[in-house]
Amino acid sequence: MQDVKINKVQAYRKALGLKQHEVAKILNISVVMYSKKERKETAFTDVEKVKLLNYFKEYIPNEIIDSLFF
């Protein structure tokens, strides 16, 4: 059986009712770049990871960076 890795960034974004352009604005990047990062075509920078973690922690307080990105 194949392991399925859940994309938590995408799942949290959708659960919070956010559109890609809204998260791109939080990260100060283009929507195209955010979309590539969410699809794991391009990696989030460390600064972007921290920004996302801090944003999501407002709603999911027990989330940690290792669980979110690795």
Report each predicted region and the residues it spans.
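A short, Lys/Arg-rich alpha-helix, primarily the initiator
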Residues: 1-15
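Residue-level detection of the helix-turn-helix DNA-binding "recognition helix"
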Residues: 11-14, 28, 39-41
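The alpha-helix within a helix-turn-helix
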Residues: 13, 24, 53
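DNA major-groove recognition helix of helix-turn-helix/homeodomain DNA-binding modules
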Residues: 47-63
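Short amphipathic recognition helices of helix-turn-helix/homeodomain-type DNA-binding modules
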Residues: 64-70
